[in-house]
């Protein structure tokens, strides 16, 4: 591993531990040339997933796009960084466990909405309004009406 301070390639590992719920390894290293200490993360390299956009274009899966969308949808709610990372980790895990290595962006959006529905209704509506390209209040009303039966069922199961 190349030292960020002196670019020497000789270092020793001082400490290793699991990170990201076991999906990566965090290593604390020390450069053998300048004694600079730095941290590295190792992650299993997975098969790339292609995303088929609405326009028909293809691009590689980019988790930061989901994180950015969730950050906007969850702004001023109680959902913050670690929960957003968890949602994206779960979606990415589902994608990598799937047989197909190409997925439509619409399917990814639905996966995000499935997670948000259980966590925060406001974030769900915000994400849905952008993802489903709402054109007016009727689109909001339809989505809100679709959420109502779910809440009634949850209340009935508690009673």
UniProtKB/Swiss-Prot annotation:
Record has Transmembrane helix as a keyword: no
Residue ranges annotated for the ATP-cone domain, each copy included: 49-139
The keyword ATP-binding appears for this protein: yes
Cofactor: Zn(2+)
Highest taxon of source: Bacteria
Location of region: Disordered: 1-20
Protein's name in the database: Transcriptional repressor NrdR
């Amino acid at each position: 591993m190349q030292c960020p301070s002196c670019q020497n390639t000789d270092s020793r590992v001082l400490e290793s531990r699991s990170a990201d719920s076991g999906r990566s390894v965090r290593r604390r290293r020390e450069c053998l040339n300048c004694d600079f200490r730095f941290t590295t993360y190792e992650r299993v390299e997975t098969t790339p997933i292609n995303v088929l956009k609405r326009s028909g274009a293809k691009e590689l899966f980019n988790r930061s796009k989901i994180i950015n969308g969730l950050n906007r949808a969850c702004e001023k709610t109680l959902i913050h960084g670690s929960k957003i990372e968890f949602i994206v980790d779960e979606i990415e895990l589902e994608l990598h466990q799937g047989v197909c290595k190409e997925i439509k962006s619409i399917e990814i959006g639905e996966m995000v909405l499935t997670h948000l529905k259980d966590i925060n209704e406001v974030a769900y509506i915000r994400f849905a309004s952008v993802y489903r390209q709402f054109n007016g209040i009727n689109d909001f009303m339809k989505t809100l009406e679709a959420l109502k039966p779910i809440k009634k069922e949850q209340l009935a199961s508690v009673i």
